[in-house]
């Protein structure tokens, strides 16, 4: 949408992803961030729910903070397909004109978000790590102070391969769209009984040559625990040296009932599967304790773990960037430190 009618666009909308009629956690995380943005703008939060027979999910969205829920309930939306979902979400945007539209950077969201942004002629910033309301340009150009725009969505994300951080705005088009990875934002506590206003919207979905027919759905069967749920993570990087040495990290994790995770280098070396990777191209985690062992601390990795409650780094390089984000740091040989630390903690636990 061009800048002729920007003032018509009001409210913060989020796409409430559901799969098999079960809401994804990212929906609640987006509501949590949307509430902050809406407070700064003096507006409300609307969740957009697409699917078939999904009206029963509206109560939960209200309990997590949505003020309104727009429901598009249509048999064509039973299982995610790009075309009908893109038509439905674009229709919602064109009808209700949100100022901001947030989408989860999931497999579904990374397909849906860009498709919809192109159809409604606006920009989209992908994989944001920070969202806030502010001025753009952030610093007014001397002599052009009147050109600075206020109450803009400032979208921050890693750029140039993660070697720098960029803050991006979309001042001349609406809605301002962003995708956010799961785990980056925090959901609000559930408020039992809180109700959202439910709005039923039934746009026409037109079958065209971009529709696909789903012949069969084969669900992946996995027994991998989710590192995003762990209270204690013992994470290893290139400095661990080998797949066999991760047994040493597992022993430390077992003391706490925690899990082992890793950096991208460990995945590339075949030491652990990508399910266990923390960072920009892995998962964002917030454990109570995060051990960074043999991890240098590249910005890509730090982006996925810097909000852990307590960070303990072990590295032989005293100048490793990881020490700048760690609460505690130990410089030395991890092959000596980790087993000694494990035994000391075991003894401490035994005495309690």
Segments from the language model and where they lie:
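N-terminal glycine-rich FAD/FM-binding segment characteristic of electron-transfer flavoproteins
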Residues: 1-352
């Amino acid at each position: 949408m061009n800048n002729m009618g920007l003032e018509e666009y009001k409210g913060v909308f989020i796409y409430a992803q559901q799969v098999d009629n079960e809401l994804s956690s990212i929906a609640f995380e987006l509501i949590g961030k949307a509430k902050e943005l809406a407070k700064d703008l003096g507006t409300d939060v609307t969740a957009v729910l697409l699917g078939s027979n999904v009206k029963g999910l509206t109560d939960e969205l209200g309990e997590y903070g949505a003020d309104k829920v727009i429901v598009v309930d249509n048999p064509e939306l039973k299982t995610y397909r790009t075309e009908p979902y893109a038509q439905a979400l674009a229709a919602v945007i064109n009808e209700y004109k949100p100022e901001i539209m947030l989408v989860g950077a999931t497999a579904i969201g990374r397909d849906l978000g860009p498709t919809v942004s192109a159809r409604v002629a606006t920009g989209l910033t992908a994989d944001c790590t920070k969202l806030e309301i502010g001025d753009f340009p952030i610093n007014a150009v001397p002599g052009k102070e009147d050109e600075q725009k206020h109450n803009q969505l400032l979208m921050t994300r890693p750029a140039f391969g993660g070697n720098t951080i960029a803050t991006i705005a979309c001042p001349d088009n609406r809605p301002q769209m962003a995708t956010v990875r799961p785990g980056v934002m925090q959901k609000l506590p559930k408020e039992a009984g809180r109700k959202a206003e439910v709005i039923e919207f039934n746009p026409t979905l037109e079958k065209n040559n971009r529709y696909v027919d789903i012949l069969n759905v084969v669900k992946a069967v996995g027994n991998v625990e989710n590192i995003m749920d762990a209270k204690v993570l013992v994470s290893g990087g290139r400095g661990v040296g080998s797949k066999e040495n991760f047994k040493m990290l597992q022993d430390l994790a077992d003391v706490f009932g925690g899990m082992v995770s890793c950096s991208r280098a460990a995945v590339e070396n075949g030491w652990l599967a990508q399910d266990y990777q923390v960072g920009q191209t892995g998962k964002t985690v917030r454990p109570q304790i995060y051990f960074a062992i043999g991890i240098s601390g590249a910005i890509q990795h730090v982006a996925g773990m810097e909000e852990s409650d307590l960070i303990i780094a072990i590295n032989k390089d005293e100048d490793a960037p990881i020490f700048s984000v760690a609460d505690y740091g130990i410089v030395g040989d991890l092959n000596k430190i980790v087993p000694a630390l494990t035994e000391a903690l075991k003894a401490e636990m035994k005495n309690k």
